[in-house]
Amino acid sequence: MEIHHTAVVSPHAQLTSGVKVGPYSIIGDNVTIGRDTVIHSHVVIDGHTRIGERNDICPFVSIGSPPQDLGYKGEDTRVLIGDDNIIREYVTINRATTKQDWETIVGSENYLMAYVHVAHDCVLGNKIIMSNVATLGGHTIVGDYAILSGLVAVHQFVRIGAHAFIGGKTAIPKDIPPFVMAAGAEGARAKLFGLNQNGLRRHGFSRETINGLKKAYKILWRETGRFSEGIRRVREEIEPFSELDMLLDFISESKRGITR
């Protein structure tokens, strides 16, 4: 373990073997950091925060600060971060409120680029890429392998499905289903632009799976006006497979509505 002499690390914090803490970083009382995680200079980690192993946390990151929520009264809510994440400069990850599960969660192997904001009660899966200045409102859920380009702004309580791709400067007021591409023009609300076929191929999806999802997309977004009708047709016309079930369940469970 290496702690720079200018860093301020609480004697109550739990740092395991191989952790490095750079100049002028501050680690609070209730922080746990797993082995071989590197904390660069000028990082602040506070609150009830647990960080896993082999994370790379760059200068001026803030993790575990209070939620930007007027109802928060200092309760002991948490931030949980997995393993092997890269968290670049000026990223902010706020602790949760008491309105849900008391936890803001970031999974493993994610890449959060500069100035990304992860608000209170967000839940991020694994292997997500969030480009510079992408912003998540509170209670947002982001699925595995999703890509959010620069300056994407996501409304609170929105869900982003696994393997979705969102183009830059896009406002996201409604749920983005798994496996699709979405974009808006210069800050406009998102619209869907088909299946994320390149991403699916890169991640090893079979031709049969991609073709089945393409057929489902065509029925749901081009041939039917109501999702209830589209789901019925898809179930009647396409042999079920796990990715198709994931897509249909995501649509059926939506509370904010589905992007078209």
Residue ranges and their predicted role:
Residues 29-31, 37:
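Charged, well-structured alpha/beta interaction segments
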Residues 238-260:
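Short, amphipathic C-terminal "tail helix"
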